[in-house]
Amino acid sequence: MGLPSQVLACAILGLLYQHASGGLIKRIIRQKRETGLNVTLPEDNQPVVFNHVYNIKLPVGSLCSVDLDTASGDADLKAEIEPVKNYEEHTVNEGNQIVFTHRINIPRRACGCAAAPDIKDLLSRLEELEGLVSSLREQCASGAGCCPNSQTAEGRLDTAPYCSGHGNYSTEICGCVCEPGWKGPNCSEPACPRNCLNRGLCVRGKCICEEGFTGEDCSQAACPSDCNDQGKCVDGVCVCFEGYTGPDCGEELCPHGCGIHGRCVGGRCVCHEGFTGEDCNEPLCPNNCHNRGRCVDNECVCDEGYTGEDCGELICPNDCFDRGRCINGTCFCEEGYTGEDCGELTCPNNCNGNGRCENGLCVCHEGFVGDDCSQKRCPKDCNNRGHCVDGRCVCHEGYLGEDCGELRCPNDCHNRGRCINGQCVCDEGFIGEDCGELRCPNDCHNRGRCVNGQCECHEGFIGEDCGELRCPNDCNSHGRCVNGQCVCDEGYTGEDCGELRCPNDCHNRGRCVEGRCVCDNGFMGEDCGELSCPNDCHQHGRCVDGRCVCHEGFTGEDCRERSCPNDCNNVGRCVEGRCVCEEGYMGIDCSDVSPPTELTVTNVTDKTVNLEWKHENLVNEYLVTYVPTSSGGLDLQFTVPGNQTSATIHELEPGVEYFIRVFAILKNKKSIPVSARVATYLPAPEGLKFKSVRETSVQVEWDPLSISFDGWELVFRNMQKKDDNGDITSSLKRPETSYMQPGLAPGQQYNVSLHIVKNNTRGPGLSRVITTKLDAPSQIEAKDVTDTTALITWSKPLAEIEGIELTYGPKDVPGDRTTIDLSEDENQYSIGNLRPHTEYEVTLISRRGDMESDPAKEVFVTDLDAPRNLKRVSQTDNSITLEWKNSHANIDNYRIKFAPISGGDHTELTVPKGNQATTRATLTGLRPGTEYGIGVTAVRQDRESAPATINAGTDLDNPKDLEVSDPTETTLSLRWRRPVAKFDRYRLTYVSPSGKKNEMEIPVDSTSFILRGLDAGTEYTISLVAEKGRHKSKPTTIKGSTEEEPELGNLSVSETGWDGFQLTWTAADGAYENFVIQVQQSDNPEETWNITVPGGQHSVNVTGLKANTPYNVTLYGVIRGYRTKPLYVETTTGAHPEVGELTVSDITPESFNLSWTTTNGDFDAFTIEIIDSNRLLEPMEFNISGNSRTAHISGLSPSTDFIVYLYGISHGFRTQAISAAATTEAEPEVDNLLVSDATPDGFRLSWTADDGVFDSFVLKIRDTKRKSDPLELIVPGHERTHDITGLKEGTEYEIELYGVSSGRRSQPINSVATTVVGSPKGISFSDITENSATVSWTPPRSRVDSYRVSYVPITGGTPNVVTVDGSKTRTKLVKLVPGVDYNVNIISVKGFEESEPISGILKTALDSPSGLVVMNITDSEALATWQPAIAAVDNYIVSYSSEDEPEVTQMVSGNTVEYDLNGLRPATEYTLRVHAVKDAQKSETLSTQFTTGLDAPKDLSATEVQSETAVITWRPPRAPVTDYLLTYESIDGRVKEVILDPETTSYTLTELSPSTQYTVKLQALSRSMRSKMIQTVFTTTGLLYPYPKDCSQALLNGEVTSGLYTIYLNGDRTQPLQVFCDMAEDGGGWIVFLRRQNGKEDFYRNWKNYVAGFGDPKDEFWIGLENLHKISSQGQYELRVDLRDRGETAYAVYDKFSVGDAKTRYRLRVDGYSGTAGDSMTYHNGRSFSTFDKDNDSAITNCALSYKGAFWYKNCHRVNLMGRYGDNNHSQGVNWFHWKGHEYSIQFAEMKLRPSSFRNLEGRRKRA
């Protein structure tokens, strides 16, 4: 902006020079800026054209450095005169004009950063610059006006023509200057610019152009596609930016051309075949290397795995190890080898898929054998009891199983059991040799027949095993059958449980009919246990012990009659429960006297007051009381006859407020009063004058008064305001006679009045008028300061002014000053032609008529100028050398800032200024292969210039520490450290001594590599280079040698056997990975197999060979997959071993001895197999050591023929079997086992046997149910009887007996015996009550089926019998009589057997009272009642206690059934207990719990009563509480409730209505308990705005905290609206209607949501279009937008803001911008609101749908505050274009509004 300002200043100085009166200060008259294009004004000379070409240095953020001396294409452009306004003049001379022409061109391809935020900000500022330059206009060259014959005159024009409201009157041209779209002398005719040049229609002052034309006046020819934003439109023809071409600039040019070997498509070269590169000038290699390599100097450098001139041939892995041929990359291996590289030995028939091949030998899977794993193997070789067919055993007769190892059972046990050694072990429920028969449970207990496993029971028995007795009628399904007797369910009785039982047998007070009691007269209840009341108390009371306890409001024996409260106090009649009061009385119980009403105060003087009132009833007299409202006053009273309704109070004190009450008196009883307040009059003050007058304050003085009064009230009223909103009232104490009034508005006229105040009453006032001083502009700030320019901004004065005077100049040169006169609407001015690094002072003064403000000053310093012509001189892999031209300013040094472009921390470097015209610096310690962004600034002290920028990169660094390790005969291992720089790949080159060169690429992530296929013992030269694109690092080179091949020899054979031998050889330690041995039959070469052994082993045992067979052996070593030359040896195996003769001796019934001989060879083991000749027993097999020649065989069956087989085993070889026959001897027997003399714990056994045969007998005894360990006894061989003791009672036992002779057992004999049932023992009684008891006993040792318990009174009677299950040891005896002795007997029963009985004596307890009830409970008292015991008792013991109080015990008479409980604590839970006492007996205790009532809080009162708040206080109750319920009700019936914490003893009521009476009620709560309510009454004071219509009025009411408030639209109490008020920002009083801060709320919503509003006002929200319309239609409002992002803040304020109604689709009106965020909202002015489902924008597309938001979109937006939160994509996020652009989503945004009139300081001060 500096250049236009300089040229303009020069032109005006030349024009005005002859009229200047001299002096250093030149005054420039500057009119109000207006937006638009250049303005043409008349001039006597030829047109003067200012043609400006701007050289734009892009900011450092763009990382571009481009100097544009001229803009391409501008030379052919001609400036056209396009005035934006019409001027009606007497003379028009288009040749006499000053024309300002500005052409600013930023070629699009000047750098690739046109979309950067800094560039957008630059463009925005250039647009603003053009607007400012185009708005400059000068007055006529002479001092006279432009009117014909006008003369030079002084003064001002007080009245100017209206210009129809569409223009401003100009004294220079003596006519109206019309706004765009209007013309005519008075600007009353709509017009378009240049009448649209007849190329379009004029509609409301705007041109709608025909097709092919555009511009405001249709003067421009339209270009196709608007040149696609890639060119300028000149006369309808696109002049394309560099890099673009075509009629619409839609085609991109290729940057370097494509030569003759390609064509340009879409900005990129498409090369002809055989050429490549950006410009198609690089020839390709043959077939483009088949994409398997890189083309270097027209030769293919093939990728790994490929070779050939064009990389068209595949390389085979490891060159097939020279064991095959390589064809097209695939190895075709020689016979005996396989694998991808022929590196593996093959196996015979590939092991037939039944094994794995390891170095040529098959390792067979489980189940397969043979050299090629072709034979299936049978499990355990079928145990020689079958033969193997295809891997499966075919078993001999009598054997089965997978390996023929099991004996077979008869009929396979019919699948009903397990086969163990050929015998069936049957499953449960089956019996027989082959488990073919079903077994019945417990053999039916011999009480039925077993048919197919099921019992058919005899009569009288039931159950699965007939073990249960059957009950009559099966107990009718109402009980359990226990040993034939019914145990009835609850509620049933009778032998077969067929009868219903009544509760408690109806207490003998009624009849039991089908289980329900029919009570006798006078009794009631389910069990007739309660006394009945007359008529059931008519449902108006409770029946207690036969008497009605009536509810409140009812009376009489049966509670039928209604009662009246307090019997109407004998001054009324009770009619159906309601009092009809006598005349003069009122209230629900006629206790109140009717009060007087409508007390009126008239004729107030300084000493008297007249009173009048109304009263409809006749009373005896009236009592009038009056007392001063101040403390300490005397309360006076007098009476008035009952026939009068007026009175006069005399002898009052002047200026005192009195509280007056009038009571009605009837029969010495007072009514409630009617009251009024009145104050006597006060005198007026004197001598009001003003001592000091400032902008916002005035010093006031006045004369003192001698009378008694409280203080002064000083009122300042703004005379420009018609209502009372401009009043500022100050209350002063009595001694004061002066006051400094602050908070006034500057330049305002005030009416000042002074009043005397006494007892809150204001006397007559004394008034004067004063005008405050003008205020100066504030918040002066110098912005956008450069080395030659600065933008001065300020806040407008609060006072109404006519203009502002701006003066600026160097601070240290007082005489060098420039003064500018500005209009009152200006708030900024741009200063140019400043000197770099110079301190300037700016002064601003407000003016209105003859009034002038004090000056406001600001100081700023211009910037340093930046260094120039920054360039790179040289670079290495860690440094860059720079050079630049020095700055003009005298600086301290230069600061270099640099950082990698890819991101990272930046580094700073300070460099001294060079002595020559340039300065050079080297940046060191840089990262290799990295491009840096570099900026250089000039620095002086703490100031820094704008940067000069450049991009420069370092070279790639080479790989580090390359070394060779682990060399072998054919490989070398390489290791190195990665370069620091980022790169694409490595290139490895190695050269042999013969000069053969090999090259390959290595992946970028590698740090090691193995060179394979090298020659043994050879030295190689190796180089490694890092590459990135076409860039290469310096090479890293090293030399390495392969190892020599180790030797192998001395193969020999030793320890030759019939099936194998041992091999040994010599080799270097650690030289070989493994050795491979090939063994081959000499006479059968097909019989060959391989053995692999580890490289550290130099001998091996070869086994599994054929006996007496010659073999050839071959051995070779393996080194890293490479085989050495083989070694050979031959050998022959020995002959097979044989077994001789087998002999049997020493035969017994169960054993014999074996012996045998051998004839040839050594044996590992012998196997003996013994089979009975009938094949009935399972064969036995024994393995004997190879050194043994004898064996003892035992465990045989007596009298059995056996065949014995024996064969030898040597090295897995089994010889032919030899055999012998043997027969075992017979064994003795035992017989006739008998049982006798059974007792509860034992019995006697007897048996027969041959004498002298047995050494002893063995008895085994075990209970049949296997519940205890078996008992085993040994009896001498001469005995034939034995007594068994220590057994369980009533238990069945199994008995087994066998004889033992010489250690051998005879066949056993078996029997069954049962012990006798035992009696129970240890009878005892527990849980004894008045009608029941529990009897317990100790059971006999054995389990019984049941117990029979009988009990009968000792005095005689019918016994009761109870049958108890045998598993129980206790039962409950019921239906007992209190205090009676019973004889109790118990018998054990098992089956049909019964034990002896046991007996005991039982005494029942006393019965207790019943029906304990606590009633009439208060907070300190209660009444306990109960039903008496059935038995006669002596006394009742009553006791009660709580958790914190000791127990209180009281004895009352046995005839008493109630007791009064006194002295209780409130809200306390008590436990009440009652029991009966007779002699030494005590009944059970009857108890209940009750809780006393909660006592109420005390001393409820209202304090600190304000207009909208009041503090309620109280004292807590004695009892602990959980909450308080506070209810307050206004006089108009609005009720609110609040739950308060228990610790609270005060509460502040808010949101009250001013001047309103409230009734407050308080109730204490303790969980479900509530106390009685207490209440108080108070009246709120008045408010300035009882129903504020916006937040500004709430602020004036004294609310200073930001938060939620209720406003009332248009001040209407019936239209409340809750809003969020910002009471802090810019004076407060703002209604916030939009907030974005965290993205919690989704703003992509439909029309309905945006009309109604959504979100949380305390978080993210939208207030709603309808609410916004209603608020803004209340008056003139201003808009404020606050923006915050990462510590940065900005704001925009618009003086005028409104939103239309639904018919206009909520059209936006906004105008009058100021602020720091930039004017982005004006773009949206006049637009209707749009959502994705209601598109009201002017764009072709749906803006809301495209940008996922909603707004007053145009085409489309510059503001998108409802956009997607955090989305930085173009135009998608929360955008404010002029602050952060379209590609940045702002973190915080708020929109708010308040009345425009609120900006004056007076209103804000009044609030304070």
UniProtKB/Swiss-Prot annotation:
Organism (species): Gallus gallus (Chicken)
Q: Name one GO cellular component term.
A: extracellular space
Segments forming domain EGF-like? 176-188, 188-219, 219-250, 250-281, 281-312, 312-343, 343-374, 374-405, 405-436, 436-467, 467-498, 498-529, 529-560, 560-591
* Recorded name of the encoding gene: TNC
The name under which this protein is listed is: Tenascin
Record family assignment: Belongs to the tenascin family.
Assembly information from the UniProt record? Homohexamer; disulfide-linked. A homotrimer may be formed in the triple coiled-coil region and may be stabilized by disulfide rings at both ends. Two of such half-hexabrachions may be disulfide linked within the central globule. Interacts with CSPG5.
The chain positions of domain Fibrinogen C-terminal read 1582-1797
**Pfam families reported for this sequence:** EGF_TEN, EGF_Tenascin, EGF_Teneurin, Fibrinogen_C, fn3
